[in-house]
Regions:
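An N-terminal boundary/leader segment
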Residues: 1-52, 289-290, 467-475
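Short, well-ordered beta-strand elements within core beta-sheets of diverse protein domains
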Residues: 8-15, 95-98, 210-217, 344-349, ...
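Acyltransferase
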Residues: 17-25, 55-58, 272-299, 322-330, ...
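Conserved hydrophobic/aromatic pocket- or pore-lining residues that grip, position, or stack substrates
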Residues: 27, 50, 72, 78, ...
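Structural helix-boundary/capping segments
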Residues: 33, 112, 162-264, 281-286, ...
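Flexible, acidic loop-helix segments that line cofactor/substrate-binding pockets
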Residues: 39-45, 237-244, 258, 264-266, ...
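Short helix-loop capping/hinge segments that flank enzyme active sites or metal/cofactor-binding pockets
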Residues: 70-90, 252-263, 313-369, 381, ...
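Short glycine/serine-rich loop/turn segments
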Residues: 70-212, 263-265, 382-401
Length: 475
């Protein structure tokens, strides 16, 4: 099927040049031919039922009922979120029969926009780690090379996008879970500013490390899905009241007026794989040729203290959400070692350490506010290593530097998370071994629209869609 984007598919359905039934059949055929190898989509719905739902969407359209831009689009939700009628396993055998009776808020909005839910996208066990493997569904393979990992925790979503199994995808992000798999599979991952996409489950006041967000093969699709997912909800007291407008309100910025601060590896603080910074810097240099100003940016911040801040807040957050599984010795023994370690560490969090972490986080935010007085956006790699062996759970060292935790190799993502600012991962290119990488851009708080308009301009100047042809030669 020839189309440029999910937004293009939407227009074709609205104009009746493509039927929902035809799209569903093509999608199911594509999944049949690619998913057995990649393992991106799990918990698939019955095919005949999906085709019937697609026909119902066509019938509704024939009667003048158009539900929204996702009318008839097949969609699979990340397997950490609830959709009615599908198991939310979170990649854990302990939750293999967890059948919710209602949609999560953002999924309800996607359903209301007309999407047809076809299944779930694969994740690491209980969403922890940036490698999408679990004992329930298995490992998701990289879109460009099945010997490599897909990243995570939205690994299934990113691979399904890159492999054209889904028109657009949702994900979530605490420690780069939208950004890392986007980078590893040459797609776009957008972590909205905190509160932009409301969350109504769990701690609605202090649970501000993770957020849902959109992924796409192009920026326009990411914007469209964000507009569906975003918007204030009375059940989410910290959700943004300001509306983002419509798709037509988003215009590419002039790159000649953009000043980017390159954070790189924070002056050799972060260990990075050889060639990774070069890949990102080459893309920034290309931005410079079209008029953007690129400058090295030294924030003069104690990054080691930010890591300790992160550990404390993450331990505390996860203990609150996963403690029931840890308290029961039977279920605790069935959790992967990394999850057991994370929850065990939470027992050592004190009121003093929590207060200190909050102070460091506040100072980090103030540091970025000062930086944004000079720069429009801050840039840094989306990961510290290129995609690695799918059989390896996580990198234990980077260029001779040992990683002391299972997630230390993703430290590059915590600054964006802790700031609460919007962050987008855009394709940065490939290394000499044809492994993809992405580059993160952090925007000021509340400036999600401005960051996405920059991303539109980036995509126009440095398009990446032709790179998907590499998949057929490497998979």
């Amino acid at each position: 099927m020839n189309y440029d984007s999910a937004t293009d598919l939407s227009r074709m359905i609205a104009n009746k040049t493509l039927s929902c039934h035809e799209l569903m059949q093509c999608t199911l055929d594509r999944i049949d031919s690619t998913n057995p190898e990649k393992n991106a989509i799990v918990a698939m719905a019955d095919k005949d039922t999906l085709l019937q739902q697609a026909q119902m969407a066509d019938n509704a359209l024939a009667q003048g009922e158009y539900r929204g831009w996702m009318h008839g689009l097949p969609h699979a939700v990340k397997d950490l979120a609830d959709i009615k009628g599908f198991v939310t396993s979170c990649g854990s055998p302990l939750l293999a029969t967890n059948l919710p009776d209602q949609d999560s808020l953002f999924a309800a909005r996607i359903r209301e926009a007309g999407a047809i839910f076809i299944g779930k996208t694969n994740v690491p066990e209980v969403g922890l780690g940036s490698q999408s493997y679990n004992t329930l569904h298995g490992s998701t393979k990289n879109a460009f090379n099945t010997a490599l990992c897909a990243g995570g925790s939205s690994g299934g979503a990113a691979v399904a996008l890159a492999m054209d199994m889904l028109p657009v995808a949702d994900g979530s992000d605490m420690m780069g879970s939208l950004r890392n798999p986007a980078a590893y599979n040459n797609v776009v991952g957008f972590r909205p500013g905190i509160g932009r996409v409301p969350r109504t489950g769990g701690d609605i006041f202090f649970g501000q490390l993770s957020t849902e967000g959109p992924m796409g093969r192009c920026v326009e699709d990411v914007i469209n899905l964000l507009l569906t997912m975003a918007g204030a909800d009375i059940r989410a007291p910290l959700s943004w009241r300001e509306e983002l407008g419509n798709l037509t309100d988003f215009k590419p910025v002039s790159l000649k007026n953009i000043h980017i601060g390159w954070l790189g590896d924070f002056d050799n603080y972060l260990a990075t794989e050889t060639g990774l910074l070069d890949t990102c810097e080459a893309k920034l240099k290309a931005l410079g040729t079209v008029g953007s100003t690129i400058s090295n940016c030294d924030l003069a911040f104690d990054m080691a203290s930010l890591w300790q801040c992160w550990l404390t807040l993450r331990h505390w957050f996860l203990a609150h959400s996963a403690d029931p599984l840890f308290k029961n010795p039977v279920t605790r023994a069935q959790l992967k070692p990394e999850v057991q370690w994370e929850l065990a560490q939470a027992k050592h969090v004190t009121t003093e350490s929590l207060g200190s972490a909050c102070d460091v986080r506040a100072n980090w935010y103030r540091t970025l506010v000062s930086a944004f007085e000079k720069y429009d956006f801050l840039a840094l790699p989306s990961a510290q290593v290129f995609p690695f062996d799918v059989e390896q759970h996580w990198p234990t060292e980077i260029e001779g530097h040992g990683m002391d935790t299972y997630h230390r190799w993703m430290e590059v993502t915590i600054g964006g998370t802790l700031s609460g600012c919007p962050v987008i991962s855009l394709p940065a290119g490939f290394d000499q071994n044809n492994r993809p990488m992405g580059i993160q851009f952090i925007g000021p708080i509340g400036e999600d629209k401005k960051l996405l308009e920059f991303a539109l301009a980036y995509e126009q100047a440095l398009p990446w869609q032709a790179d998907y042809a590499r998949i057929e030669h490497q998979s």
